[in-house]
Regions:
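Alpha/beta-hydrolase-fold enzymes
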Residues: 152-245, 257-265
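N-terminal non-catalytic accessory region
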Residues: 1-103, 107-161, 184-187, 191-192, ...
Length: 419
């Protein structure tokens, strides 16, 4: 990115990539809202007056994104901006007008939104979000009940116990769970019989959760066999040797943490997005992203009073005496998901439902990449979550956002407001 942005113009002539590719219509690159036009030469000439140094701001993903946002603010204020006064000798008044553009990946989007929208930090000119789990990701439920898959399990946990011991005590990780706004509050956790039909509760309502748009009480705090931390996994909520002396039990601490997650989600949703926000995300039906979490099997033995619950911590309940107990399987529902199919697929981590949330919230532009996207660039498969910025479509969308945001900059001497 830095190399591309530092070579926009030479002798007032656009360099090859900018002239050949950057000027194409956003719709060709998967832009789905139709509110923005192509970059023009004047915009590129203005952008070329600025220096685009790329600074990497890390954060602790275990702590709340609210706190991580403050850490990023301190990094900008104490390291990034002072650098240009100390090392480049810029005038203090000019430095005081300088702002940054945030380019985020995944969870970093939540950090950036907390920074600008919750803390009101004003030295951000605009934001480019990449593959942000904007309203959460149901993948976290799968990981806490089954462990991670593939090579990731070596580091992040191979079963429910290993994952729960860390994630259930980590605000930042739990803030990745689906919020009340995920899929507009509609169900994403389904209890089905062996034939794939959604079961009914004693009131005749489908056992599809959340039933009442409250995943915090219905799923995350629930100690039932299908809860995020069922009773048999409560032992992993506190792995220390001091449990006996604690005044408040591990389950109580966990529920307090869930309450703080709900508060964070609610405040972030109400605060919206920075006024200059551009987003891109993967939306490919071949990238299974655990959109529907389905427990398939007969739960009757698990719901019998006094029953001893046992599961293999990889998503399957077991018993010496009963077969066909619930196991987690991939969606979609065999009986047909009554929900809109527009949110299916994703990038193997963030479901389309969550990736498309910024567009639904009305950000400046949103690029949908993969089989569910449109435009000439979407003739190939959508990208995988971790590798997103290695894809030319994500790179194009990010550069487009940066150039558009730069039009608001005013601290160069040749720009309005400059010195």
């Amino acid at each position: 990115m830095e190399r591309r942005l530092e070579n926009i113009v030479s002798r007032r002539e656009l360099q090859a990539w900018w002239n050949d590719e950057a000027l194409s219509p956003p719709a060709d690159q998967g832009e789905e809202q139709g509110k923005v036009g192509p970059i023009d030469e004047e915009e590129l000439l203005k952008a070329s007056r600025y220096q685009f140094d790329v600074w990497c701001a890390g954060y602790n993903w275990l702590q709340s994104n609210r706190q991580s946002a403050l850490d990023v603010r301190d990094y900008i204020e104490n390291t990034v901006l002072p650098f240009y006064q100390k090392e480049h000798g810029l005038d203090p008044e000019q430095v005081s007008r300088m702002k940054v553009i945030l380019v985020t990946h995944s969870m970093g989007g939540l950090v950036a939104r907390a920074l600008t929208q919750l803390h009101g930090y004003e030295r951000v000119l605009g934001v480019v979000h990449g593959v942000q789990p904007a309203t959460g990701s149901s993948t976290i439920y799968h990981h806490m009940r089954c462990g991670y898959e593939g090579i990731a399990q070596v580091v992040l946990g191979r079963n429910a116990g290993e994952v729960t011991a860390v994630v259930a005590n980590s605000a930042g990780a739990l803030e990745l769970a689906p919020s009340a706004e995920y899929r507009e509050g509609r169900p994403w956790l389904f209890l089905c019989d062996a034939q794939g039909q959604v079961l009914k509760d004693i009131d005749g309502k489908p056992r599809a959760y959340p039933q009442n748009q409250d995943p915090y009480e219905e799923i995350y705090k629930s100690s039932t066999w299908y809860g995020l931390v069922p009773e048999q996994n409560a032992q992993y909520l506190d792995m220390s040797d001091k449990k006996e002396s604690l005044r408040v039990g591990p389950r109580d601490n966990f529920e307090d943490l869930i309450d703080s997650i709900a508060k964070f989600h609610g405040e972030l949703s109400a605060a919206g997005y920075h006024s200059e926000t551009y987003a891109h995300y993967g939306a490919d039906d071949s990238r299974h992203s655990w959109r529907d979490l389905i427990w398939k099997g007969d739960p009757t033995p698990l719901e019998t009073p006094g029953a001893t619950l046992n599961d293999d911590e990889n998503g399957t309940y077991n018993s010496w005496f009963r077969r066909g107990l619930p196991t987690i399987v991939q969606g979609p529902l065999e009986a047909g998901n009554p929900l809109d199919a527009s949110g299916s697929g994703g990038d193997e981590t963030v479901p389309t439902d969550s990736g498309q949330a910024p567009a639904l919230a009305g950000v400046k532009a949103s690029f949908r990449h993969g089989s569910k996207g449109k435009g000439q660039a979407n003739t190939k498969r959508g990208y995988e979550h971790q590798e997103s910025y290695n894809d030319a479509r994500a790179q194009w969308a990010a550069l487009y956002g940066v150039i558009k945001i730069t039009q608001l900059a005013d601290w160069h001497p040749n720009d309005k407001g400059g010195t």
